[in-house]
A protein has these predicted regions:
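Gly/Gly-Pro- and Ser/Thr-rich, intrinsically disordered tail segments characteristic of DNA damage-repair
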Residues: 1-142, 146-148, 162, 200
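DNA-contacting surface of Y-family translesion DNA polymerases
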Residues: 116, 121-209
Length: 209
């Protein structure tokens, strides 16, 4: 579909801009990625300045606005990137991280989906502060391995590195419509279009399902 080709072309432009600064780029979607700029191609010591430059380059080359989150780990950077959408930069500094997380609703946590957020709500866990009252053992019992991550995240701890060579575990496609689709015929037509695009991408990569 032509629209997918446009998305892909713009995505490639954005990813090329990221690569101008660092090879440590871990894509999350067509237009979003983690970047580790601790050491970077520009010799800059400021991640905030790099984020500003990248935003400006994206606008200059694609005429699209972008938001950025700057912090010392992936969890906090992702949360920060959602704060100033669609066209801002938000920084979570190390000495302010725990206070920020304590006030944050758990449904804003990166990695907490709707089902988990609902379960947390049932348990009286509504904010980072509530989550912090739980022991690592109790969180692990309730949420499994993810519970250990939540225990660390709420304390501003995330040791995951930016994985530029991350193994692809899924394949998808998305499309944005100018108007909401209310009619079932339109929805099914859109799903059929997206399914065909996923099939095309899977064949191209010789994936099987």
């Amino acid at each position: 579909a032509p629209r997918f080709d446009v998305y892909r072309s713009v995505s490639n432009q954005i990813m090329q801009i990221f690569q101008e600064y660092t090879s440590l780029v871990e894509p999350l979607s067509l237009d979003e990625a983690f970047l580790d700029v601790t050491v970077n191609n520009k010799g800059s010591r400021s991640a905030t300045l790099i984020a500003k430059e990248i935003k400006q380059k994206i606008f200059n080359r694609t005429h699209l606005t972008a938001s950025a989150g700057v912090s010392y780990n992936k969890f906090l950077a992702k949360i920060a990137s959602d704060v100033k959408k669609p066209n801002g930069i938000f920084i979570i500094e190390p000495d302010k991280a725990e206070d920020f997380i304590e006030k944050l609703p758990v449904n804003k946590f990166f990695g907490v989906g709707k089902v988990t957020a609902k379960r947390m709500d049932e348990l009286g866990i509504k904010t980072g502060y509530d989550l912090k009252q739980w022991s690592e053992l109790d969180l692990a019992r309730e949420f499994g391995k993810a519970g250990i991550s939540y225990y660390n995240f709420v304390r501003g701890i995330d040791d995951r590195e930016v994985e530029s060579e991350r193994v692809r575990k899924s394949l998808g496609a998305e499309v944005t419509f100018l108007d909401d689709l209310d009619e079932i015929v339109d929805i099914l037509g859109a799903l059929d279009q997206i399914a065909h695009e996923v099939h095309r991408r899977a064949e191209k990569r010789k994936f099987m399902a």
